[in-house]
Structure formats: structure tokens, C-alpha cells
A protein has these predicted regions:
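Extracytoplasmic/secretory-pathway segments with low complexity and glycosylation-like composition
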Residues: 1-93
Length: 93
């Protein structure tokens, strides 16, 4: 099985725009825990998503309430306890 992957599109947004998260190569029809870390290094409460029958889930992040700066995202496959790599996106004024 391939290592879980997370892709962020786009990687730079103006405050108020959306960021799209695509998670692939997770265990199908199970749960994954998505982590979002603020620019100051503190983490929001993780969000649990259910993967589809291909081991994928997709999520939109609304940047309206996010701070200006660079955020990190990674996702844990709860069935295997394997983490994706960390990916980043930046919110600009």
C-alpha cells in the first residue's frame, strides 16, 4: 500500500479564499484524522474524516477566520497509524 498523501491547492491564498485538501492512499472506508497547525505552532482541534472506497477524502478550508501566515497540514490514517507528510499553505492579506 502506498504511503498516505495530502495535497493542498492552492498553496497561497488571500484571506477569505478557500484552500482545498485532497487526501489519497489512505485505508478505504475507514477514518483519518486531519491536523492543522497555526503559524504560531499551536494546533487546532483535529478533524476526523471518513475515507471513500478508494481511500480518499476531500475537504475545503475557509481561510476567513485564519491568521495571516503559514499553516501546516498532515493527516493520520487511523487504521494504520501512518501519517502523511506535512504540507503547507500560506494565508496573505
Amino acid at each position: 500500500m502506498a504511503r498516505p498523501q495530502v495535497t493542498i491547492t492552492p498553496t497561497r491564498v488571500k484571506s477569505g479564499d478557500s484552500v482545498y485538501v485532497a487526501a489519497t492512499s489512505f485505508t478505504p472506508n475507514r477514518t483519518a484524522m486531519s491536523h492543522l497547525v497555526r503559524p504560531d505552532g499551536t494546533e487546532y482541534n483535529p478533524l476526523r474524516f471518513r475515507t471513500n472506497d478508494r481511500g480518499e477524502f476531500f475537504h475545503r478550508i475557509d481561510s476567513t477566520m485564519l491568521d495571516i501566515g503559514t499553516f501546516q497540514v498532515w493527516v493520520e490514517d487511523e487504521a494504520t497509524n501512518v501519517n502523511s507528510d506535512r504540507v503547507q499553505f500560506t494565508v496573505e492579506r
